[in-house]
Amino acid sequence: MSDQNLSRYDLRGVSASKSEVHDAIKDMDKGLYPQAFCKVLPDLVGGDPEYCNIMHADTAGTKTSLAYIYWRETNDLSVWAGIVQDSIVMNVDDMACVGCIDDIIISSTVGRNKSVIPGAIISEVIQAAGTFIQKMAEHNVNLYLSGGETADVGDIVRTIDVGITAFGRIPRSQVIRNEIKSGDVIVGLASYGQATYESEYNGGMGSNGLTSARHDILSKVYRAKYPESYNPKTPEHLIYSGSRELTEIIDVTDDIRLSAGKLILSPTPVSYTHLTLPTKA
């Protein structure tokens, strides 16, 4: 495909359609319920024909690169707690789509470039996982951290990658099979605002499309300052081609003002209904 036919997203080395991935898995077994949002397996761990297993893996994606430059600009380590929430919620939200919403075991996989990611960040990431799990327990969502792997892989990771693998076991009768039919009502929940468990306003960006978000929003001043934060094969005109600076204050509402960096880095919200009902307009 010629460059003229490629989108800005494609030219940045990512794919919105994931067509290559879909092609690679097209002949694989789809599990018990082929239309379900996640693959649902028989109860391999318990052997109960009335139960099933769900295992899921995801990461915070390139949002970690954004957190990296925000941390470099502000020295604010707390931004990494949001990244940990992103990596966990990207899993549990997907699992919720098939009905698995409690008693989930998680394991973390962190790959870092030790040259630019110090031990203080690793400590923040590990501690933040425990803090988020405790917060969810207070809202009757039970997550259990089984451990994980932290690897120094500077030859393949430019900054840091934070991923989670999650496992759940539920009755088959609880599975949402995604058998949508005429007459069904689909309710959408806004990702922005402030949920019952959140301490501040959430910009609603989540963890999808961050490659475009950070490059289209943020100023070219970060291009020269942090070459480790982007793919060096990206066309120069698509690297940090926006106008905003990370610490630039944005007037969200009459009484909410947050930096552009904080808005984009707002952690992915948990989409369980009893947690997402807003406490504030």
Give, region by region, the residue ranges found by the protein language model.
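Helix-biased detector of long, well-ordered alpha-helical tracts
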Residues: M1-L275
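A short, hydrophobic C-terminal helix/tail in secreted or cell-surface proteins
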Residues: T276-A281
